[in-house]
């Protein structure tokens, strides 16, 4: 099983290293024969001798083309002859490529920006994470004394925790009498002990939570200050930091550094991404949070160190559990796109699609288009096109609602209509599909590059799902599920990739044709559905909600199932409408904002959720009760009464302060904030008192009654004293409770001012319930 690949240099020559796990043992394979190359398209082949003479300089050394070879390729499906230009070292490519491109005889150069080790994996057909080797995992976490505003890495690391299958341990340099704590003499010895632990346990995968931007950069900084090395790599190298967009990424040679933070940010949508919040969202278990100022106080006074050690141990344990949960999916994505987990886990879906396409292009002898330069990128960003069809919803409270949607609408359109850059407006074509409204033509004489790959992916997914049904082995079933989910992620990203401004296979015409066909098919379903006696309540891109006013639930379900069968007989190719479900009751506020309840009593909302941390508990609680009154009891009047009661209690200061706390996260050093919001103002006041505030810290505050801006009246929850302080009732009514429910009750004719306890407006349910 290939874990990773890179290259080293010996005597000026590159040597590919393949890090592998084989029969339970780690090994490294070397290849000294692979050479870097780029492609050049010439105006006239006779100019190749001139091109061969092009030289450049790199670190005082002359860079030259070592060999040339004429090759037959395809470019967007059309035959093309290009020259393959070999160089001595991968770093020669950036040194010489612009000189080659600028030569008068050169039309353009291609595939000059594919990293050498990744090029090797593609060309040799090697796939990381293939095989059944059992990998070993170790989670690592650190606790520091880091003061906001001070130099990064100035404060010491006070604890390092680690966890694996054997359990979790903490290393520290102050005496703590706990069975899982190991005490050493100094911070220096603690870091050296971590190195020893990693070398002894020799994990294949090191799991962290934000290790790219905090744990490892901090460890490296402290090791440097203390004059010690951090040889964590299997080749005894130190962790290597590199820029990746706005963030850092840390690589450990011979091991997979699996940072959960970017993976979880890409995979799930949460109001906050603290380790505690993620753990609760995934496993439904709570974990105590110990704040930075509490850690500092415990370390300085010696009181409460056991609590900090337990917190540190749990950090490592939770990171390990989360790592084991998320790693298999990233491993399957790595197998699918053919690049290492380290890269895949830090990639956007657009980049995952691109690596997959680069590999498949090589297999099919296709020359990959170049990435856009800055000017072309800016031009693409300015381009726009019409998206999916969204129908304004029918207002009111509805009963007996069916949900119908297309199975993989956009991938199905791409395959059915052969939507691809190489089929677009193709000359000498016998059969075309013409996109409605936009008029772009796609050749049907041959399968397009991207539609054929997408078709293979969807076919493979169906086979995997079939095997899952047949399999009786739970382990195999789980692995197959990870595989089919990885395919789904990739398949659903192709439409977005066509419109991704940085894409090699960017195709605005393809993207707008896909949405045009999407609008046509959903409109066809709408018209046919209305002809069948249904009332369409809401449409959004690939799905819709409908009912038959006055009909019984079973009749609505039965007719909907018959309709699905009928419409699918009329739809072309892979297009297929599915019966998604039945809802007892629901209402639609505006586009992408609605709430439904199924027959089991489960409430489903979209666009109405106030899950962000900057909503107080009282706002969330009131909204939940309002939804329950409307959907479970069918009683809008009851919902209004609930809001009035809450606003009355707020006005009379009868709501406990813990329900008024607003949480916001500090996302950057305090000195970098230009706009001072309430959470920043509170954080600055805490920092002035010696509390260690750092990026990632969540600030909880309550807004007090008084004059002046909110930022001056916000107080940290820890400092709020009910005997001394009064919360600002008007702020919580106008900026928390009413906005949370107004968007719902507006659908039933209520305005914000109608919902306060001192103002009333009687509107009965009968005016809104449809029969």
From Swiss-Prot:
One of its GO terms (molecular function) is DNA-directed DNA polymerase activity. Its EC number is 2.7.7.7. The keyword DNA-binding applies. Keywords: DNA replication, DNA-binding, DNA-directed DNA polymerase, Nucleotidyltransferase, Transferase. Transmembrane segments: none annotated. GO terms for biological process: DNA-templated DNA replication. It catalyses: DNA(n) + a 2'-deoxyribonucleoside 5'-triphosphate = DNA(n+1) + diphosphate. SUPFAM superfamilies: DNA/RNA polymerases, Ribonuclease H-like. Belongs to the DNA polymerase type-B family. This is DNA polymerase 1. It comes from Pyrococcus abyssi.
């Amino acid at each position: 099983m290939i874990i990773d690949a890179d290259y080293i240099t010996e005597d000026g020559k590159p040597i590919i290293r393949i890090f592998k796990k084989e029969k339970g043992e780690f090994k490294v394979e070397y290849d000294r024969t692979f050479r870097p190359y780029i492609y050049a398209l010439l105006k006239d082949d006779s100019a190749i001798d001139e091109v061969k003479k092009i030289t450049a300089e790199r670190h005082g050394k002359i860079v030259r083309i070592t060999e040339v070879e004429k090759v037959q390729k395809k470019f967007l499906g059309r035959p093309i002859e290009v020259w393959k230009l070999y160089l001595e070292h991968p770093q020669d490519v950036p040194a010489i490529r612009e000189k080659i491109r600028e030569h008068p005889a050169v039309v353009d150069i291609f595939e000059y920006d594919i990293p050498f080790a990744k090029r090797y994996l593609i060309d040799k057909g090697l796939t990381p994470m293939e095989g059944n080797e059992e990998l070993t995992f170790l989670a690592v976490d650190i606790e520091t004394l880091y003061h906001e505003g001070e130099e990064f890495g100035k404060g010491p690391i006070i604890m390092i925790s680690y966890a694996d299958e054997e359990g979790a341990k903490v290393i520290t340099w102050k005496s703590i009498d706990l069975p899982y704590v190991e005490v050493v003499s100094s911070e220096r010895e603690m870091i050296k002990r971590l190195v020893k632990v990693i070398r002894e346990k020799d994990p294949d995968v090191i799991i962290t939570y934000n290790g790219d931007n905090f744990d490892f950069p901090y460890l490296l900084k402290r090791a440097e200050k203390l004059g010690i090395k951090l040889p964590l790599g299997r080749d005894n190298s130190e962790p290597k930091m590199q820029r990746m967009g706005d963030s850092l990424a840390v690589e450990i040679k011979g091991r997979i550094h699996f940072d959960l933070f970017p993976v979880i940010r890409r995979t799930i949508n949460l109001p906050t991404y603290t380790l505690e919040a993620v753990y609760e969202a995934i496993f439904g278990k709570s974990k105590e949070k110990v704040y930075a100022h509490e850690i500092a106080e415990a370390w300085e006074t010696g009181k409460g160190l056991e609590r900090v050690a337990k917190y540190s141990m749990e950090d490592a344990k939770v990171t390990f559990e989360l790592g084991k949960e998320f790693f298999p999916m990233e491993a399957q994505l790595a197998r699918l796109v053919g690049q290492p987990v380290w890269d895949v886990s830090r990639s956007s879906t657009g980049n995952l699609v691109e690596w997959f396409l680069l590999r498949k292009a090589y297999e099919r002898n296709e020359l990959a288009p170049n990435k856009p330069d800055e000017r072309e990128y800016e031009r693409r960003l300015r381009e726009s096109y019409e998206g999916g069809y969204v129908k304004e919803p029918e207002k009111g409270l509805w009963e007996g609602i069916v949900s119908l949607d297309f199975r993989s609408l956009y991938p199905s359109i791409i395959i059915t209509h052969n939507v691809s850059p190489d089929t677009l407006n193709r000359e000498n074509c016998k059969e075309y599909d013409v996109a409605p409204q936009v008029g772009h033509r796609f050749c049907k004489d041959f399968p397009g590059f991207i539609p054929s790959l997408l078709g293979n992916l969807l076919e493979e997914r169906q086979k995997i799902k079939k095997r899952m049904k047949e399999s009786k082995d739970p382990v195999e079933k789980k692995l197959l599920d990870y595989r089919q989910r990885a395919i789904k992620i990739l398949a659903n990203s192709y439409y977005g990739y066509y419109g991704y401004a940085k894409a090699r296979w960017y195709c605005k015409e393809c993207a707008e044709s896909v949405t045009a066909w999407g609008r046509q098919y959903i409109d066809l379903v709408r018209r046919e559905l209305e002809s069948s006696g249904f009332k369409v309540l809401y449409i959004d891109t690939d799905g819709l909600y409908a009912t038959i006013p006055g009909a019984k639930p079973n009749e609505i379900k039965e007719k909907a199932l018959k309709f699905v069968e009928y419409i699918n007989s009329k739809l072309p190719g892979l297009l297929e409408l599915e019966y998604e479900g039945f809802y007892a009751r629901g209402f639609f506020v505006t586009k992408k904002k609605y709430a439904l309840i199924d027959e089991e009593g489960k409430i489903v909302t979209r666009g109405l959720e106030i899950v962000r941390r900057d909503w107080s508990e009282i706002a969330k609680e009131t909204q939940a009760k309002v939804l329950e009154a409307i959907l479970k009891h069918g009683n809008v009047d009851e919902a209004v009464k609930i809001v009035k009661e809450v606003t009355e209690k707020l006005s009379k200061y009868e709501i406990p302060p813990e329900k008024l706390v607003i949480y916001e996260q500090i996302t950057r050093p305090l000195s970098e904030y230009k706009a001072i919001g309430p959470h920043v103002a509170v954080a600055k006041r805490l920092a002035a008192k010696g509390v260690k505030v750092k990026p990632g810290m969540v600030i909880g505050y309550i807004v007090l009654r008084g004059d002046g801006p909110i930022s001056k009246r916000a107080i940290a929850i820890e400092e709020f004293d009910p005997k001394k302080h009064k919360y600002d009732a008007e702020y919580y009514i106008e900026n928390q409770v009413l906005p949370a429910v107004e968007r719902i009750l507006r659908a039933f004719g209520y305005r914000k001012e109608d919902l306060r306890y001192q103002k009333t407006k009687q509107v009965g349910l009968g005016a809104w319930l449809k029969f």
